Amino acid sequence: MSLIADERECAKQLAKFFPDLPATRFLVRVQSARPGREKLQESTVVEFGMGQFAIFTTSLPLEFDERIRLVQHSGGKPVEAEVIALQYHEGMKAVAVRFVEGTWDWIMQP
């Protein structure tokens, strides 16, 4: 299996706990919001998401209940979210987050 397929499978495993989240694919930049970790960031793909929740894979050392920022790859205002679940699958890590201030409008865009 390829690395991309492995990442998608990891996200799919976590999405089983969020059956109402549709599959989606768009690029974001994930940034740690923890003081002293501001330089920790990476680009990734949101694989599942709608309204208040999103699921993506990451190599960042994120933990349960940690605050992060998501920035749409094409720009825009960062959105703060909280890690609510982690899934490890064959060396990969998927993260589910809940947006701190309601829904994330980008997810509603086609």
What does each of the following model-derived ranges do?
Residues M1-P110:
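Structured alpha-helical
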